[in-house]
Amino acid sequence: MNRINQLFNSNKKDILSIYFCAGNPTLDGTVNVIRTLEKHGVSMIEVGIPFSDPMADGIVIQNAATQALRNGMSLKILFEQLRNIRQEVSIPLVFMGYLNPIMQFGFENFCRKCVECGIDGVIIPDLPFRDYQDHYRIIAERYGIKVIMLITPETSEERVREIDAHTDGFIYMVSSAATTGAQQDFNEQKRAYFKKIEDMNLRNPLMVGFGISNKATFQAACEHASGAIIGSRFVTLLEEEKDPEKAILKLKDALK
């Protein structure tokens, strides 16, 4: 069974997933960040593939991607860095990246390399669901790679149900149609959206992302989903502290 399915089948509550951009702040720090996050109780990790035009991301992750590319990070190097990662960590690892670099690498080759490294899934924010269905699903399923789809407050109920019926792993529930970035709290409109999706009783578990940065936002997300994904806040702390251990301890402190 895929590690993503194992995690959610365990009925674990308040799942914490952390995003960071591979190659930032240093080119060779990827494995150490992953190792450190697992050590400190993170349940799942999203490894960002840097891209020059990350349209769904706010300024923090845009800057991290720019720095990672300047440092020389590429998909080829990332796969080389992660080739023995399963000797060190056992939690689910998910790539998050845009379609362009993945297509340049070749989608089937990308899936093959994911299997070799023990990557469990991929989130591609700019991959339309229809394109996934028509062109990529058969390849991803052949290799056992979960393609995680995003939904937003603007996603129709019909499309949400369609995504739920034709994907596996979890559904990434974006807290707003805006870009990524830390928020202090969620307003009533966002909370109502979370509840509406929760009340649809979908087949797939839900994870909330975009804007999670503190106890209030983390708890609000976990109230209506299996857990939450934190990206921008951890990326900021990682750059400030220059040490993944200090960064994750500071973040976990903010979630208490």
Swiss-Prot record:
GO molecular function: tryptophan synthase activity
Catalytic residue list: 46, 57
Keywords on record: Amino-acid biosynthesis, Aromatic amino acid biosynthesis, Lyase, Tryptophan biosynthesis
Reactions the enzyme catalyzes: (1S,2R)-1-C-(indol-3-yl)glycerol 3-phosphate + L-serine = D-glyceraldehyde 3-phosphate + L-tryptophan + H2O
Domain of life of the source: Bacteria
Main enzyme class: lyase
One annotated GO biological process: L-tryptophan biosynthetic process
Pathway involvement of the protein, from the record: Amino-acid biosynthesis; L-tryptophan biosynthesis; L-tryptophan from chorismate: step 5/5
Enzyme Commission (EC) number: 4.2.1.20
Matching Pfam families: Trp_syntA (PF00290)
Keyword Amino-acid biosynthesis listed: yes
Transmembrane stretches, start-end: none
Gene Ontology CC, one term: cytosol
UniProt xrefs under InterPro entries: Aldolase_TIM, RibuloseP-bd_barrel, Trp_synthase_alpha_AS, Trp_synthase_suA
Similarity comment: family membership: Belongs to the TrpA family.
Function: The alpha subunit is responsible for the aldol cleavage of indoleglycerol phosphate to indole and glyceraldehyde 3-phosphate.
Summary of subunit composition and partner proteins: Tetramer of two alpha and two beta chains.
PANTHER family: TRYPTOPHAN SYNTHASE ALPHA CHAIN, CHLOROPLASTIC, TRYPTOPHAN SYNTHASE, ALPHA CHAIN
Name of this protein: Tryptophan synthase alpha chain
Source organism: Bacteroides thetaiotaomicron (strain ATCC 29148 / DSM 2079 / JCM 5827 / CCUG 10774 / NCTC 10582 / VPI-5482 / E50)
